[in-house]
Design a protein with these regions (language model features):
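N-terminal glycine-rich FAD/FM-binding segment characteristic of electron-transfer flavoproteins
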Residues: 52
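Residues at structural and domain junctions
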Residues: 2, 18, 74-78
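Compact nucleic-acid interaction/catalytic patches
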Residues: 3-6, 15-48
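C-terminal terminal-subdomain/extension
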Residues: 56-99
């Protein structure tokens, strides 16, 4: 499990993006952000909701729906978004700092 790995979301359509620092990998939970289908009616807010392409589809990072899940729910990653670190961190900063 690594920060910015993407996992299938068994609860709803879309994925979960792991945003927790790898330093805390000993915990039995992970902080995640849902990645929702861009055609699902969710209107992205600039800076808060970047859009990523995963498995040929476009998915919105629903930063305001940040949650914690048991690590055991996250199986094999289907994608890695480490190359989008700046966009992801900017969205988290927008949520917590307002900029």
């Amino acid at each position: 499990m690594a920060r910015f790995d993407v996992y299938r979301n068994s609860a709803i359509e879309g994925f979960l993006l792991d945003v927790q620092a790898d330093l805390l990998s000993h915990l039995n939970t992970r902080v995640v952000v849902p990645l929702l289908p861009s055609d699902g009616g969710f209107q992205p807010a600039r800076g808060l909701n970047p859009v990523f392409e995963i498995e040929g589809g476009r998915f919105v990072m629903a930063t305001q729906f940040l949650a914690t899940v048991p690590s055991s729910l996250l199986k094999a990653p289907v994608a890695r978004l480490g190359a989008s670190r700046t966009e992801i961190t900017t969205a988290l900063d927008m949520l917590f700092q307002g900029f």
